[in-house]
Amino acid sequence: TADDYVIYIDTDSIFASAVPLVQKRFPNQELTETMMTQRIMEICGEVQDYLNKSYDYFAKKFCNIDKHVFDIKQEVIAKSGLFITKKRYGLRIINDAGRKVNKIHVKGLDTIRSNFAVAMKDLLQNVLDDILADVPKEKIDERISVFKRNMTSLHYDVMANPIGVKGIGKYQVKDAESVF
């Protein structure tokens, strides 16, 4: 719905849009990226405290235990994200554990797979960077078109899948004149 904040949930993670919460809490304010990050951290701190106190209550009331080890904490603030499927996403992180950063975090996408062609990984990483930087679609399409036009001039080492055959040295050609 229009009021949904949660974007992605996994076993131990939740990604939510804090922008609607900030806009509701601080209406009619023009916020710089730094101010927006500070406001998000304030709200995250409140949510974190509330959830952790709820776990204290839950542990005592429903499990009859005084102490539990479950602890919620805010880890990153991302300016943008691309969520494909479960455990496959990319984030442009601007704050990591309270430190200002500008980095891309990738989970499960082909840009980090070791058995994916280097040229394709580079292209996909550049396209992901463009998407997360809100580059217009036309410019991204042009990047892909240029890559496709230049593919035939790329060396096979960067176009081939970087895989090997285990124990290939034990296979030898018996007849030097025979192709097979």
Label each PLM-derived region with a short phrase.
Residues 1-11, 18-180:
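DNA-dependent DNA polymerase catalytic subunits
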